[in-house]
Design a protein with these regions (language model features):
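N-terminal charged segments
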Residues: 1-71, 86
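A conserved beta-turn-beta hairpin within the catalytic core of GNAT-like acetyltransferases
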Residues: 40-46, 103-105, 171-179, 188
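A short, internal acetyl-CoA/4′-phosphopantetheine-binding micro-motif in the GNAT/acyltransferase core
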Residues: 48-54, 181-188, 217
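Acyl-donor-binding surface of acyltransferase catalytic domains
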Residues: 53-128, 153, 241-242
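Conserved acetyl-CoA-binding loop-helix of GNAT-fold acetyltransferases
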Residues: 57-65, 183-185, 189-202, 206, ...
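Conserved GNAT acetyl-CoA-binding A-motif
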Residues: 71-81, 204-215
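Conserved active-site alpha-helix within GNAT-family acetyltransferase domains
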Residues: 83-98, 194, 218-237, 244
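Flexible, substrate/cofactor-facing loop regions flanked by secondary structure
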Residues: 117-182
Length: 246
C-alpha cells in the first residue's frame, strides 16, 4: 500500500466521497445515508451502509426498501467489502447485484496529488463539458450531482474550441474527489487524460487538498492502469447489494 492509504479510515473516506457526490435526496438512517437522484449513478441512488443504522440490520434494510420505492429507484445498498455489516446484509436475504449497469464492484483508489500535479486546471462551465460527461440532454439530477458537493471544478481540454477531454473534481476537506474523466474517441491515445489529471491535481492542491480519491469499476482496466501510473493504489472496495426477488 502507498504511504497515504490509511490516512483516512474506510468509513471516513466513504463519507468524503459521498459529500463530494451529493444526491438529490439524502435521508439519514442512523449513520447510514439513503440516497436518490433519479437513477443517475449507482453512488447517488444507493444507501451508504457505513456505521450503525441504529436499528437491527433487517429492519434497516426494510426502511431502505421503502425509501427506494418512494423515490422510484431500485433498492440498493452500497456495502464496503469485508465490512462489519456485509454478512448481516447477506443473512437478511440481500445479494450482490451482478447486473448493476455500472458494475457490481468498484475500487476506491487514492494517491498523493503532488506525485502527478502538473499545471493548474481552469474551472470553466462549458456546454461541451456537460455534453462529454453527461450527454446531450442533461437532467436536473445530473446538474445537481455534478454541480454541487464541496468546491467543484469542471476541468477540460479543448481543440479548436471543442471540448475533447473533461473531468470533474470536488474538494472536500483534504481530499480531491475525481470523477467523469472522459476523452473523445477521436482524441484518445494522445496523453490527454494524463495531462488533464495533472492539471486537476494542481487545482486541487491550490484548494488545500493533498490526496485524490477515485471510485472506479473493477472492469475498467484502462482507467485503473492510468490511475496506477499516476501513483494511486487501492484503498478498499465496495459492492452494490439488492434484495432477493420475492
Amino acid at each position: 500500500m502507498g504511504q497515504d492509504e490509511r490516512v483516512h479510515t474506510v468509513d471516513h473516506l466513504e463519507s468524503l466521497c459521498a459529500r463530494a457526490w451529493p444526491a438529490l435526496a439524502e435521508v439519514p438512517l442512523g449513520d447510514w445515508s439513503m440516497r436518490a437522484a433519479a437513477g443517475f449513478t449507482g453512488r447517488a441512488n444507493s444507501t451508504l451502509t457505513c456505521g450503525d443504522p441504529g436499528i437491527p440490520i433487517p429492519d434497516a434494510l426494510k426502511v431502505v426498501e421503502g425509501f427506494a420505492a418512494g423515490h422510484g429507484i431500485k433498492p440498493t445498498a452500497h456495502v464496503v467489502r469485508g465490512s462489519a455489516h456485509e454478512a448481516a446484509i447477506a443473512t437478511a436475504g440481500w445479494h450482490v447485484d451482478l447486473d448493476h449497469p455500472g458494475g457490481a464492484e468498484s475500487l476506491v483508489m487514492t494517491g498523493p496529488l503532488e506525485k502527478f500535479a502538473e499545471g493548474v486546471a481552469e474551472n470553466l462551465d462549458l456546454p461541451g463539458w456537460w455534453e462529454l460527461t453527461a450527454g446531450s440532454e442533461v437532467s436536473a439530477a445530473q446538474r445537481h450531482v455534478l454541480g454541487s458537493g464541496g468546491t467543484v471544478c469542471f476541468a477540460s481540454l479543448t481543440d479548436d474550441g471543442e471540448v475533447v477531454a473533461a473531468v470533474r473534481g470536488a474538494v472536500v476537506e483534504d481530499v480531491l474527489h475525481v470523477a467523469r474523466l472522459a476523452v473523445r474517441p477521436s482524441h484518445r491515445r494522445q496523453g490527454l487524460a494524463r495531462k488533464l489529471m495533472g492539471e486537476l491535481a494542481g487545482w486541487g492542491l491550490q484548494q488545500g487538498a493533498t490526496t485524490c480519491a477515485l471510485q472506479v469499476a473493477e472492469h475498467n482496466h484502462p482507467a485503473i492502469r492510468l490511475y496506477e501510473e499516476l501513483g494511486c493504489t487501492e484503498h478498499h472496495r465496495y459492492r452494490y447489494w439488492i434484495p432477493a426477488v420475492s
